[in-house]
């Protein structure tokens, strides 16, 4: 075994076959595994690792997508597509703290739900936090304890300001099992000139006996949609506390009445 360690870790396993260099190790493997750094352990603590994360400073909102409408800017007359997001009885339920959970976050609930449609576990959770049962619950991570909002606080559309940028998260529409032309925009093969039953095929999926397999990441038919999608730097066009809606520029992934999470844009703060 000592003779094996004198060379490379990939030593000769077959006669007259060399797989890599036979240069000796600079440090024996047994010694390398026992080397410890002189840096204090606090540099690698979960608290400092969490502090290094790029996180928003404020909590976010849960909204419901109601549809799209054109929006006209009064100052410039510019017309742009806008998505209308409804804010209905959004309330802070509880906190996550670094001392207990290892990170800071606010748990937020949307709307209200009848007691008969809430599981016993969630009923106990809402009762312990002294809030009414919610239709949807989500968690928003924040940078530190300054971003925590007192439980029971109702959040309104004015939580965001007109003109600011936000990150929008939602689940896209499910398209089912689709081919490569619909899923990835492949051109497909010829319609005629000898092409048979391969018109919408993806072409070659591999090479030859070497490597003898389909390489990872190959674009192939499969389930399309129903994925978590984040759109960054979306502009807030209008905030309406009277009607409890937020207008954001452009489209948002997901069908109507789907839940959408909004938080301050991480790349604009």
UniProtKB/Swiss-Prot annotation:
InterPro entries: Ribosomal_uL3 (IPR000597), Ribosomal_uL3_bac/org-type (IPR019927), Ribosomal_uL3_CS (IPR019926), Transl_B-barrel_sf (IPR009000). It comes from the Eukaryota. The keyword tRNA processing does not apply. One of its GO terms (molecular function) is structural constituent of ribosome. The keyword Transit peptide applies. Its main location: mitochondrion. Transmembrane segments: none annotated. It is found in: Mitochondrion. SUPFAM superfamilies: Translation proteins. GO terms for biological process: mitochondrial translation. GO terms for cellular component: mitochondrial inner membrane; mitochondrial large ribosomal subunit; mitochondrion. Keywords: Mitochondrion, Ribonucleoprotein, Ribosomal protein, Transit peptide. Residues 1-19 form a transit peptide. Belongs to the universal ribosomal protein uL3 family. Present with 3200 molecules/cell in log phase SD medium. Component of the mitochondrial ribosome (mitoribosome), a dedicated translation machinery responsible for the synthesis of mitochondrial genome-encoded proteins, including at least some of the essential transmembrane subunits of the mitochondrial respiratory chain. The mitoribosomes are attached to the mitochondrial inner membrane and translation products are cotranslationally integrated into the membrane. Component of the mitochondrial large ribosomal subunit (mt-LSU). Mature yeast 74S mitochondrial ribosomes consist of a small (37S) and a large (54S) subunit. The 37S small subunit contains a 15S ribosomal RNA (15S mt-rRNA) and 34 different proteins. The 54S large subunit contains a 21S rRNA (21S mt-rRNA) and 46 different proteins. This is Large ribosomal subunit protein uL3m. It comes from Saccharomyces cerevisiae (strain ATCC 204508 / S288c) (Baker's yeast).
């Amino acid at each position: 075994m000592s003779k094996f360690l004198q060379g490379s870790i990939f030593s000769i396993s077959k006669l007259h076959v060399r797989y890599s260099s036979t240069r000796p190790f600079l440090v024996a493997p047994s010694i390398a595994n026992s080397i410890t750094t002189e840096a204090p352990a606090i540099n690698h603590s979960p608290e400092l690792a969490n502090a290094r994360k790029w996180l928003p400073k404020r909590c976010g909102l849960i909204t419901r997508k109601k549809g799209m409408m054109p929006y006209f800017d009064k100052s410039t007359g510019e017309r742009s597509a806008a998505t209308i997001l409804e804010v209905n009885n959004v309330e802070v339920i509880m906190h996550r703290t670094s001392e207990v959970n290892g990170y800071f976050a606010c748990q937020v609930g949307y709307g209200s739900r009848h007691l008969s449609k809430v599981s016993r576990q969630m009923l106990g959770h809402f009762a312990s936090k002294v809030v009414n049962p919610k239709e949807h619950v989500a968690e928003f991570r924040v940078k530190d304890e300054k971003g925590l909002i007192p439980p029971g606080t109702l959040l309104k559309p004015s939580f965001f300001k007109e003109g600011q940028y936000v990150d929008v998260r939602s689940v896209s529409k499910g398209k089912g099992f689709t081919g490569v032309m619909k899923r990835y925009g492949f051109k497909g093969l010829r319609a005629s000139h000898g092409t048979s039953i391969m018109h919408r095929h993806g072409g070659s999926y591999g090479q030859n006996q070497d490597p003898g397999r389909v390489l990872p990441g190959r674009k192939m038919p499969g389930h399309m949609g129903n994925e978590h999608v984040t759109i960054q730097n979306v502009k807030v066009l209008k905030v309406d506390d009277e009607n409890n809606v937020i207008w954001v520029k452009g489209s948002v992934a997901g069908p109507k009445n789907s839940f959408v999470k909004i938080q301050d844009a991480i790349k604009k703060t």
